[in-house]
Amino acid sequence: MDGRGLTLRSKNRRPRPQISAPKPISGPLPQNHQPAASGSGTASSGSGSRDYASSNHATSDLVKRRYSTRFNQVPDFDGAPPVPSVPQVPSAYAGLGPPQPSRKQSAESSGPPEVDLTALRDPSLPVDRYVTNLLANASEDDIREYQQALRKVKNRTSTDLQQNVYQNRTQFIRISQEADKLKGEMKTLRSLMAELTTALGQTAIGDSPNPMSPTLDERASKRSNRSSVANLESMWNVQLQTLWKTVEGSQKFLPMVPGRHIVLETGNWAELDSATWKPRRPVHLVLLNDHLLVAAKKRKRVDQSNPNHRGPVPTKLIAEECWPLQDIDMIDLGANLTGSAREEAEDRGITNAVCVRVGSKPFTYRHDKRNSTAKSELLATFRKTVEDLRRTLRSETEAAGKNGESLGFMSAINSRNSLLCSPKLDLSENTDNPRDRPEVRIDVDGKQQNLRWVDSQVDELDIDIALQRFEEAVSNIDRLRKLARGLKGNAVAQDVINTKVDERAAKLAGILSRSLVDTHGFPVATKTNVVWLTRLGFEDQARESYLKARSDVISKRIRTYQQCFPSVMTSACIKWAKHHLDAFNALLTRQLSSVQRGATVWQNCINIVHEQAGILAEVGVDFTDLVAKELELTEEEKAARPEMTRSESLIMGLADAASFFNMYGH
């Protein structure tokens, strides 16, 4: 074994050790046995340990060689191509994936899902898929809270939309007014440039004699007239420049326009509160030939550290309001007062006050001196100035109309159509001079108003519709329609008012129809909406909207019940009921076979059967037409109805007696 070496596959194995049977120890071993055993063990311990160590080392080396592997060519892992990247999910569907399950399933939910406004603003959002993925693991309470959050977002969005509409409408009105002012200034500049061009052209003409030219005397008279007009214009320009220096901010209200001049300037006035008649601030009134300027008196800033300052506090005038004379009315508040009312008005000083009405806004001004004639002078001058202005505008309009007659009838028709179709009526578009404006006035409650007043009323109507003040909007539409019907002699104003009012009425009717559809289940709201639509003249639209809403509800309920009770279950139920009904009819026919048809007993039995069928009809099972269908009497049998036999009368008597005994016997 030593010559061939050690191997694990050697067939010459050592014999297995045999374990001897246990030997009982009955007494101590002999003394000569212990040394011998110990001596032999000691002698063989050195050689045995060395042989065991060498054999153990060789065996472990062979085991390592047996279970080890040698690779001649190691694969090159560094030279392998890179792993391809995962494709990105589109951003529109990034949040629509299924919710990943959490590692820790908590007993309590993490709360309702939040409302993602960014996702809801996406117009291409797949709503069904989004809601399904969002509420996949939500409880009933979470879904209810999420629904309430969506309602709050909807209400907040609706409120923001209404506020934005109102703000945009107000800004649009303000911008349109500024555009009108800018348009007037541009036309004024155009006219001034035209006059300048004409003057330069006239100066370029030579002084050659003309046989058609006037004489020297005529030239002198015309030159004097021109010089007087020029002097008057220069004087008016000086007045305006002085006004600009005296009243701060008046130049933006009253720019330099040819022919504009000051007619009357009066002070010592106070603006009053229209509700309490208490003075607000001292004002200064300036009446021009085409405008009325109101300037407020305010104190100047004074250096208190200056010791030389003495006397009253200096004041300055600041322009606050300026209105065209065509847009205002001036009323004497003390003209129609009598008796105790006049005495009370005199105590308050109202007899010296005037009211300036601009559209629907009143402004009250009172003179400080009660015995002064400033109020009467202001009223007389105002009326005379307004009359002169109207006469001038009328003459200029007639002259412009005569010059434009050569354009023909079609041009007039086209201008009228453009006037009616324009969203914002402006009669100054066809004229080059702001003074060449056709004056279209209407009579409103005994007062003359122009079409700007109509535009202001239409603007208020738009604001009422935007703020959903439906009662005020419907009342304003009725009032404007009544006003248009009264303008029989003014076709242009009547057409303009009807066009604008009909457009707003159609818009308001659409809003009310949608409200009627949303609240058709509430009687009070439905009645209110129907009344408003009837007043607007949209009865047919109200009827169709209400009936369509009710039809949609009925169709929805029918679909709901059909989903709850499929056709298979319905057919089985009807089949079961028909089977039992046929069995009952057969039993009833068999029981009444021994009774004569048409007799009293027969008829009583049929009546009882129909009463029982009526009870079933009360719970929704109507078998009245099918119960005892073949036992009904014909018309001939009813006419030839037999009399009750003796046995039948006896049976009926016993039955009546039994019923009477049951009722009163106990």
UniProtKB/Swiss-Prot annotation:
Bias kind Low complexity: ranges: 36-55
Example of a GO cellular component annotation carried by this entry: transport vesicle
Protein location: Cytoplasmic vesicle, Secretory vesicle
Pfam families for the chain: Exo84_C (PF16528), PH_EXO84 (PF25345), VPS51_Exo84_N (PF08700)
Residue segments, region Disordered: 1-120, 203-228
Keyword hit for Protein transport: yes
Coiled-coil residues: 133-200
Keyword hit for Coiled coil: yes
Record-level GO BP terms: exocytosis; Golgi to plasma membrane transport; protein localization; protein transport
Keywords tagged on the record: Coiled coil, Cytoplasmic vesicle, Exocytosis, Protein transport, Transport
Self-association and partners: Component of the exocyst complex.
PANTHER family: EXOCYST COMPLEX COMPONENT 8
Similarity comment text for this entry: Belongs to the EXO84 family.
Function recorded in the entry: Involved in the secretory pathway as part of the exocyst complex which tethers secretory vesicles to the sites of exocytosis. Plays a role in both the assembly of the exocyst and the polarization of this complex to specific sites of the plasma membrane for exocytosis. Also involved in assembly of the spliceosome.
Name under which the protein is recorded: Exocyst complex component exo84
Native organism: Emericella nidulans (strain FGSC A4 / ATCC 38163 / CBS 112.46 / NRRL 194 / M139) (Aspergillus nidulans)
Lineage: Eukaryota, Fungi, Dikarya, Ascomycota, Pezizomycotina
